């Protein structure tokens, strides 16, 4: 039997689930335990196909709009946050609802409301159509928030009063891209009000930094995450910028060994909504084909946890 070729695998750390994702999944699981199935979930609880399929098997029913859920069953709002109109509609229907919005997304909602109450014109840096952006813009009256996606958008933005502008951001953006947009806004509007603490969340930042640390040494980077996961897509982009050929895959089945022909070092990471079992699946598949030397590249320690809603605590 021919010997397997050697392959160094650099495993990014931190990777995978963040505290907000962990909390959101627990909310659905505990709601099913407490209230029985079905429990309805408005939008995918987190953007990962494997997580969604597992929760479906437990008794979760995923819908895109609240009117697709019956009045007499619990409904959970996804980790990405929802416009104010959604809980208002649930209350008017006397529905039992549980809000799994990540507390760090809720922080952005509070900031946006504070700026609005202070009479500032608000800029949201984010990706059009992403549920988090829809939810943040939906905290305020229509037209109160201007969405900016690029430096070009920042240069074209024309506020009513250049001295009275504030910005907030989506939590799952590219740290580097966002810094460029913020720099452009600050250059144009020196008095622009900024978040007290950066809106891009600790987990997004840490995972991007971990990718930078391994992608500079790896020829190929494999990112585990679904294509609709903003933070996972950003990890692949960060890897490419750092010089690696980066591929975003759902699971080990998506691994193409032609990517690894002539490759000595591969980096592996997972987006904040991707379970660790998917990483292990890739490592197992690599070990079938290669003599793997595994190195964990630890760039940060995460100790953040978030409390469950009172209705499910204990």
Curated annotation (Swiss-Prot):
Q: Where does (2E)-4-hydroxy-3-methylbut-2-enyl diphosphate bind?
A: 47, 80, 130, 171, 229-231, 273
Q: Quote the record's cofactor note.
A: Binds 1 [4Fe-4S] cluster per subunit.
Q: Which residues form the active site?
A: 132 (proton donor)
Sections of the chain in a coiled coil = none
Q: Which UniProt keywords apply?
A: 4Fe-4S, Iron, Iron-sulfur, Isoprene biosynthesis, Metal-binding, Oxidoreductase
Q: In which pathway does it act?
A: Isoprenoid biosynthesis; dimethylallyl diphosphate biosynthesis; dimethylallyl diphosphate from (2E)-4-hydroxy-3-methylbutenyl diphosphate: step 1/1; Isoprenoid biosynthesis; isopentenyl diphosphate biosynthesis via DXP pathway; isopentenyl diphosphate from 1-deoxy-D-xylulose 5-phosphate: step 6/6
User: For binding [4Fe-4S] cluster, which residues are annotated in this chain's numbering?
Assistant: 18, 102, 201
Biological process according to GO = dimethylallyl diphosphate biosynthetic process; isopentenyl diphosphate biosynthetic process, methylerythritol 4-phosphate pathway; terpenoid biosynthetic process
Which GO molecular-function terms appear in the entry? 4 iron, 4 sulfur cluster binding; 4-hydroxy-3-methylbut-2-enyl diphosphate reductase activity; metal ion binding
Keyword check for Cell cycle, yes or no: no
Name the chemical reaction catalysed here.
Answer: isopentenyl diphosphate + 2 oxidized [2Fe-2S]-[ferredoxin] + H2O = (2E)-4-hydroxy-3-methylbut-2-enyl diphosphate + 2 reduced [2Fe-2S]-[ferredoxin] + 2 H(+); dimethylallyl diphosphate + 2 oxidized [2Fe-2S]-[ferredoxin] + H2O = (2E)-4-hydroxy-3-methylbut-2-enyl diphosphate + 2 reduced [2Fe-2S]-[ferredoxin] + 2 H(+)
Tell me which residues bind dimethylallyl diphosphate.
Answer: 47, 80, 130, 229-231, 273
Q: Which residues take part in binding isopentenyl diphosphate?
A: 47, 80, 130, 229-231, 273
Cited function: Catalyzes the conversion of 1-hydroxy-2-methyl-2-(E)-butenyl 4-diphosphate (HMBPP) into a mixture of isopentenyl diphosphate (IPP) and dimethylallyl diphosphate (DMAPP). Acts in the terminal step of the DOXP/MEP pathway for isoprenoid precursor biosynthesis.
- Report the family membership: Belongs to the IspH family.
What is the protein name for this chain?
Answer: 4-hydroxy-3-methylbut-2-enyl diphosphate reductase
Q: Which organism is it from?
A: Phenylobacterium zucineum (strain HLK1)
């Amino acid at each position: 039997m021919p010997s397997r070729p050697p392959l160094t695998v650099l495993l990014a750390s931190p990777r995978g689930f963040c505290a907000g994702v962990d909390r959101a999944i627990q909310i659905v699981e505990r709601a099913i335990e407490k209230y029985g199935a079905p429990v309805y979930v408005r939008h995918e609880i987190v953007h990962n196909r494997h997580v969604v399929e597992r929760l479906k098997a437990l008794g979760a029913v995923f819908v895109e709009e609240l009117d697709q859920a019956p009045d007499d069953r619990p409904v959970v709002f996804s980790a990405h946050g929802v416009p104010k109109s959604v809980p208002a509609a649930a209350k008017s229907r006397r529905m039992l609802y549980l809000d799994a919005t990540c507390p760090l997304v809720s922080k952005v909602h509070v900031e946006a409301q504070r700026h609005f109450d202070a009479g500032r014109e608000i800029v949201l840096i984010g990706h059009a159509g992403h549920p988090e952006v829809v939810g943040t813009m939906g905290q305020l009256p229509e037209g109160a928030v201007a969405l900016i996606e690029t430096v070009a958008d920042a240069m074209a933005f024309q506020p009513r009063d250049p001295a009275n502008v504030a910005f907030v951001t989506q939590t799952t953006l590219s740290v580097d891209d966002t810094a460029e947009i913020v720099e452009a806004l600050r250059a144009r509007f020196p008095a622009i009000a900024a978040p007290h603490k950066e809106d891009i969340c600790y987990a997004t930042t840490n995972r991007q930094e971990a990718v930078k640390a391994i992608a500079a040494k790896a020829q190929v980077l494999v990112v585990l995450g679904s294509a609709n996961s903003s933070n996972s897509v950003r990890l692949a982009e960060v890897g490419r910028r750092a010089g690696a050929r980066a591929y975003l895959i759902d699971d080990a089945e998506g691994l193409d060994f032609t990517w690894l022909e002539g490759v000595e070092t591969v980096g592996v990471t997972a987006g904040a909504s991707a379970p660790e079992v998917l990483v292990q699946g890739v490592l197992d598949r690599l070990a079938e084909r290669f003599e793997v030397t595994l190195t964990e590249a630890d760039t940060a320690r995460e100790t953040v946890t978030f409390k469950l809603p009172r209705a499910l605590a204990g």
